């Protein structure tokens, strides 16, 4: 085993996921030194795009595998984590240097639920990644490992002096989330008294309550992204105080809006816009404003991989850093609410059926 570590990328067949794999293959310092585990829901029917990309892995001597993980199933997540942990423990594959939680789910014209009984956006974007991360902590590189969460402006972010997109800012009437969060009941994703179950179970901003309202699905996606950012902050704080895991870094990146299949469950106009128009506009948008709202998957993949491996500008242990593309940014006010974050963490332990001994994180409860 000559590799320095393992890189795991969830959702490797999607637009950004495939671009991340392509960028890893393109970098000589990564393709030969790291073993790749690229997860897809179905390694046959759901992997055509990434399989085409991986056709040239052999020519750059990149050892890798496709691993089936259905993030809509907690049992599937547990099976995959057991498999990875077993192989790291017996030396078949090296410890995890980078765990990139890329997979996502968004829908506007439908409202889907998992067999576990959760809202699909909540489970795929957040809960399954929460479970996978805690289960895999034992297999992380304890000196240099990084866990990377993918954020989104749809949760809220603040770049001082540059941009504001916050569910809690009443003056934000023209921002990209303005119409999503205009109704008073949605100006906080978690209102007091804190209730995470409505979001988890799909009762919050449901299609049944808002038939035909495309913003209902966008809100659920944004709320799931808020949960991911709360997880990123909570986990980075807990890991920092853990004597065995304190050298592991937890980072987050907002990759921006890109041409991808994430919008295929939307109205046909939006699908065509994202599929055919945005790919033409994105390169110009990146040239004009590299970290603006619209970006190419190539640019975003570069930012994601940089956050997972860069030491020159981010340092050896960039724990707790949130990036908007390639720039350090700040999360919104609700993501900083310590009580909400703790409540979500504790409730998520119940939702994911996590028990003592499942994770090596000392402050797991």
UniProtKB/Swiss-Prot annotation:
Entries under Gene3D superfamilies matching the protein: NAD(P)-binding Rossmann-like Domain
Glycosylation sites: 90, 291, 324
Gene Ontology molecular function, alphabetical: oxidoreductase activity
GO CC annotation: membrane
Main location: membrane
Coiled-coil annotated residue ranges, if any: none
Enzyme Commission designation: 1.1.1.-
Pathway: Mycotoxin biosynthesis
Tagged with keyword NADP: yes
Function per UniProt: NADH-dependent flavin oxidoreductase; part of the gene cluster that mediates the biosynthesis of ilicicolin H, a 4-hydroxy-2-pyridonealkaloid that has potent and broad antifungal activities by inhibiting the mitochondrial respiration chain. IccA to iccE are sufficient for ilicicolin H biosynthesis and the roles of the remaining enzymes, iccF, iccG and iccH within the pathway have still to be determined.
Protein name as catalogued: Short-chain dehydrogenase iccH
Organism: Talaromyces variabilis
């Amino acid at each position: 085993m000559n590799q320095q570590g393992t890189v795991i990328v969830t959702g490797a067949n999607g637009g950004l996921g495939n671009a991340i794999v392509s960028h890893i293959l393109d970098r000589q310092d990564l393709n030969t030194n790291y073993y790749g585990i690229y997860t897809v829901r179905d390694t046959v029917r759901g992997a055509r795009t990434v399989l085409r990309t991986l056709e040239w892995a052999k020519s750059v001597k990149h050892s890798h595998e496709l691993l089936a993980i259905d993030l809509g199933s907690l049992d599937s997540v547990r099976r995959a984590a057991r498999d990875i942990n077993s192989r790291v423990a017996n030396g078949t594959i090296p410890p995890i240097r980078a765990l990139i939680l890329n997979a996502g789910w968004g829908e506007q014209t439908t409202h889907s639920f998992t067999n576990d009984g959760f809202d699909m956006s909540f489970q795929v974007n957040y809960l399954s990644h929460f479970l996978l991360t805690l289960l895999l902590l034992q297999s992380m590189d304890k000196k240099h490992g990084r866990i990377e969460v993918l954020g989104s402006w749809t949760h809220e972010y603040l770049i001082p002096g540059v941009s504001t997109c916050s569910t809690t800012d009443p003056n934000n009437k023209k921002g990209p989330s303005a119409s999503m969060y205009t109704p008073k009941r949605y100006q906080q994703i978690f209102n007091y008294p804190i209730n995470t179950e409505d979001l988890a179970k799909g009762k919050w901003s449901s299609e049944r309550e808002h038939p035909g309202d495309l913003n209902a699905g966008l809100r659920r996606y944004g709320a799931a992204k808020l949960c991911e950012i709360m997880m990123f902050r909570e986990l980075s704080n807990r890991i920092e105080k853990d004597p065995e895991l304190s050298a592991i870094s937890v980072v987050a990146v907002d990759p921006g809006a890109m041409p991808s299949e994430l919008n295929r469950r939307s109205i046909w106009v939006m699908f065509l816009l994202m599929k055919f128009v945005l790919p033409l506009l994105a390169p110009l948008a990146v040239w004009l404003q590299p970290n603006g709202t619209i970006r190419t998957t190539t640019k975003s993949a570069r930012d994601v991989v940089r956050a997972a491996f860069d030491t020159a500008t981010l340092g050896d242990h960039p724990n707790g850093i949130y990036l908007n593309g390639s720039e350090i940014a700040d999360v919104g006010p609700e993501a900083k609410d310590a009580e909400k974050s703790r409540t979500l963490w504790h409730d998520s332990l119940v939702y994911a059926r996590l028990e003592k001994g499942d994770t090596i994180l000392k402050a797991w409860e």
